[in-house]
Amino acid sequence: MPERQGKDSESHVSSSCTSTSNSVACFGQYQYTANEYQAIQHALRQKLGPEYISSRQAGGGQKVCYIEGHKVISLANEMFGFNGWAHSVTQQNVDFVDLNNGRFYVGVCAFVKVQLKDGSYHEDVGYGVSEGLKSKALSLEKARKEAVTDGLKRALKCFGNALGNCILDKDYLQAVNKLPRQMPPELDLVKTKRQDYEPEIEKARYDGCLERQNPGWRQQCEMAPTCKPTHTEASRVTEDQKQPSSSGNTDSPAVECDATYQRKLRQKQLQQQFWEQMEKRRQVKEVTPSSKQATANPPVKHSTPAAVQQELAIEEEFFADDLELWDISLETTDLNKLMCHKAAGSPAAQQPPETPHRRHQMTTRNRTPQRMHYHKPPVRFAQLQPSAALTSNSHGANQRTPAEHSPYRRSQSWKKRRLEPT
């Protein structure tokens, strides 16, 4: 059964390869050169040292030697290359699944085939067992993986001593067990992979793409004195910014062959553009507040006309926080006298307040700080003087001073009001 499936798969692969172009060879049709064949054959004849061999206790207290799966795979990659061999599971069967006291016992066998890129292959059977697990799925998983790994090691063992065939020699095992084991080398941080990007692989892949697109590219690159450009990076960045459209035409094949340099150059361009944008934004933010201040408060110079200065003073006085102005009743106050009192230094504010006997008026106190003294008469008084003069003639008997409506004088008037008999 496995042989029939293997023949069917081989016929399918051969038919698919013949249907494609003859220039591209499929896996299994590559031919080793004489040097490659001789080097691989010599490497497979070597026997493994004690560093590759592990041991464990088997049933009955017997000591068994074996090779770990990851070590076998590493050895195969060294011998044949990462793309020089492949393995496949041709068949896998579950022999038994038993449930005993809530625990599962599973046995699985698998047929594994290992094939090289020239078409030669070896196939063997592996077996995996799982005992005592409470989960049926985990038992099947463990048994299947163990069967495939065992079949892979047995199939690779058929290629030579370097892949594990020497372990079957008992005399060799006795001699190897007497040899001292070498200490594993210390971890070299330089050789460890610390980032995702591999510049050598990227450069080789880029060169391969260029070579497939342009067969004569390799000769041009070899004829060039160097693959590095003669200009510095700074000049290159400025040239690319000034002439973005013609940069693709002026680049030489020597610059195109270095993918790493182009990537770094692109990063520098983007960084420089980013910093230029940030500098422009910072300059705009600095100019905007200064322009606002210049428009809000224009400087008054000696050459400024007097009319303009008067308009600025009127506007400033009009928007001043004159809270005393809102406590004045325009109907009962003579604004002409009020302006005279203000100009004389508010003498009425120094006199004791008079208690109004005519009526009591409910007022609320404003908690905003009041300005008691003014250096300039309010402009609104001058604007309202004509209208106030008309009302002062009809209400001349009921004149009041601003001190009567001042929030600082109300508390004293209320105290006097409480002391007076009703």
Curated annotation (Swiss-Prot):
Region (Disordered): 1-21, 228-255, 281-306, 343-422
Signal peptide range: none
Compartment(s) where it occurs, according to its Swiss-Prot or TrEMBL record: Nucleus
Coiled-coil annotated spans: none
Location, primary (coarse class): nucleus
One Gene Ontology molecular-function label: DNA binding
SUBUNIT field: The full-length protein forms heptameric rings.
Keyword check for Chaperone: no
Pfam annotation, one family: Rad52_Rad22
Compositionally biased tracts (Basic residues): 357-378, 412-422
Organism: Gallus gallus
Gene Ontology CC: one annotated term: nucleus
Keywords: DNA damage, DNA recombination, DNA repair, DNA-binding, Nucleus
Basic and acidic residues bias (residue ranges): 1-11, 230-242
Function: Involved in double-stranded break repair. Plays a central role in genetic recombination and DNA repair by promoting the annealing of complementary single-stranded DNA and by stimulation of the RAD51 recombinase.
Keyword match Zinc: no
GO biological process: DNA recombinase assembly; double-strand break repair via homologous recombination; double-strand break repair via single-strand annealing; mitotic recombination
Biased composition (Polar residues): 243-252, 384-401
UniProt name for this protein: DNA repair protein RAD52 homolog
Superkingdom of source: Eukaryota
Biased segments, Low complexity type: 12-21
Cross-referenced PANTHER family: DNA REPAIR AND RECOMBINATION PROTEIN RAD52, RAD59 (PTHR12132), DNA REPAIR PROTEIN RAD52 HOMOLOG (PTHR12132:SF1)
DNA-binding region positions on the chain: 153-157
